[in-house]
Amino acid sequence: MSTIISYFGFLLASIIFTLILFISLSKIQLI
């Protein structure tokens, strides 16, 4: 059970990190 939770947390963190990178790149292109 804890393995599934830790895997879900890692997946969520990677998605958030990717979104932050994408947003920052978009802002750089807009400028």
From Swiss-Prot:
Q: GO terms for molecular function, please?
A: electron transporter, transferring electrons within cytochrome b6/f complex of photosystem II activity
What membrane topology term does the record carry?
Single-pass membrane protein
Whether Transmembrane helix counts among this entry's keywords is yes
Provide the family line.
Belongs to the PetL family.
**Name assigned to this protein:** Cytochrome b6-f complex subunit 6
The answer to whether UniProt assigns keyword Plastid to this entry is: yes
| Lineage top rank: taxon | Eukaryota
Transmembrane segments in this chain: where?
Answer: 3-23
Q: Which UniProt keywords apply?
A: Chloroplast, Electron transport, Membrane, Photosynthesis, Plastid, Thylakoid, Transmembrane, Transmembrane helix, Transport
Q: What does this protein do?
A: Component of the cytochrome b6-f complex, which mediates electron transfer between photosystem II (PSII) and photosystem I (PSI), cyclic electron flow around PSI, and state transitions. PetL is important for photoautotrophic growth as well as for electron transfer efficiency and stability of the cytochrome b6-f complex.
Q: Where in the cell is the protein located?
A: Plastid, Chloroplast thylakoid membrane
Give the GO biological process terms.
photosynthesis
Any Pfam family = PetL
Instruction: Provide the species name.
Output: Abies homolepis (Nikko fir)
Q: What Gene Ontology cellular-component terms does the record carry?
A: chloroplast thylakoid membrane; cytochrome b6f complex
Q: How does it assemble?
A: The 4 large subunits of the cytochrome b6-f complex are cytochrome b6, subunit IV (17 kDa polypeptide, PetD), cytochrome f and the Rieske protein, while the 4 small subunits are PetG, PetL, PetM and PetN. The complex functions as a dimer.
Q: Which HAMAP family match?
A: Cytb6_f_PetL
Predominant subcellular localization, coarse grouping? plastid
Fetch the InterPro entries from UniProt: Cyt_b6/f_cplx_su6
